[in-house]
Amino acid sequence: MCIRDSNYLVKLSVKERIYVAVNKKKFIEGIDRILSKNSYDRIVIWRSSFGWDVPLYQRPQHIFSNFAKQRTLVFYEVTRFTDDVKRIKKQADNLYLVNYANTAFSKLLFQELEKCKAPKYVQFYSTDWTLPAAKIKEYMQQGYKIVYEYIDDLNPHLAGTDELPVNVKEKYDLAMTDKNIFVVVTAEALKKDVIEKRGNVRLAFSSNGVDYAHFHDGCDPNFKCDEEFESILKKGQPVIGYYGALAKWFDYDLLKKIDQENKYQVVLFGIKY
């Protein structure tokens, strides 16, 4: 079975497995060319179903674009639902998009990574529900250091379920009990939770931010706002912009208080959950 559109289900393709096997030497040479470069000091494997080419350019793209600029070789997971990547694609220097669902190719990648002496890390989101804790333990046994990004309150609504997905809960429990795992938090409440469970060990605080250049440098100087937005600008008041999910955990009460002040204009950009 072989599907040829952008949702390339390569993991189901017998033809793809044969193609990788026949061209094994070529693929290994390509991977080795990447690993032989003197442009990095460490390697990060990003495992997540977030994807790269998604409507909201958010934390993962910001972080790993900058990691790549700071001598970190990144192999960033993309999904068959978001990115048309059969095997591997160079996104930027030191930044490669990888379809790990292509097990034939990813096996070759990890085979060559095993020979590499640079420090290696596996990094993933706390909210990721696709990667099981057993796989994380497998990475640890292979010598990878683990980075657990505790980015949000663990809420089943994020996954669209009534209960917290098993993979989310088990990875959280693993991160809270194994002090060899690095934990990155984005908020004080999450930091407090971690300290209560495992102390202030291998803990880093990294709040969400904005990649200013991403939003500014590509602006079209001739772009014209629609009439509704022009009317907001003409009011001459400070504009507060929000960019992110419009979900039940959003503080709508705070929004109402700001509106009552009648001093600001608020513009919301995001996907409604």
Feature map (PLM): residue ranges:
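Short N-terminal targeting/anchoring amphipathic segment
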Residues: 45-47, 98-99, 111-130, 147
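A short, histidine- and acid-enriched strand-loop-helix "catalytic/donor-clamping" loop
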Residues: 52-53, 147-163
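N-terminal subdomain of nucleotide-sugar transferases
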Residues: 7-83, 261
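Nucleotide-sugar donor-binding and catalytic loop/hinge architecture
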Residues: 34-41, 115-117, 139, 219-239
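Conserved donor-binding/catalytic core segment of Leloir-type glycosyltransferases
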Residues: 229-250, 255-256, 261, 266-267
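Conserved small/polar residues in nucleotide/adenosyl-binding loops
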Residues: 1-6
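Membrane-proximal helix-turn-helix segments that form the acceptor-binding/catalytic region
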Residues: 63, 153-154, 162-183
